[in-house]
Amino acid sequence: NEAYNEKYLGLLVYIGRSKRKAFSYLKDRIWNHMQGWNERTLSRQGKEILVKGVAQAVPTFAMSVFYLTKTFCEELSSMIARYWCSQQDNENKIHWVGWQKLTRSKGRGGLGFRDIHDFNIAMLARQVWRLVQEPKSLCAQLMKAKYYPNSSVLEVEETANMSYAWRSICHGIELVKQGVILRVGKGESIR
């Protein structure tokens, strides 16, 4: 059981069936930060800086490697939204503006908070893009040998033996495909 709690670079080495349990440490870290902030009286601008600079930054490294479920991301967003709207520790206030509107850019009438799920997909798409752009890197060669030896990273199909990290990266493939245009070069990879 101890092996299941091993961490490397702050990330779990083994992700079991329960993703909520595996990533609960992210919620705990954000919650602990926000509890410390509640003791201070902060202006809206102060809260905005703390939310953007700390609460939304804490899960960034994990999100660049693992897919966080939409439900889990909604729980994180809900926790942040409750903090944003509350005045004191146990005091709930009315949300006058929906969280979706707050995640819009400032130019579009929002506050520029991140949509955590969309940001997670974008971070995973970034990993896919690295595999596409740097096929000679050690990581790309390792992934190609294990998961797509006879095709491109953009043509990967899900199989039963995929690790959770690779399955997570596959969530970013569709986003990359939306922005990629096939360019015919020498014609060697065209079927």
Annotate each language-model stretch with its function.
Residues 1-191:
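A helix-boundary/hinge signal
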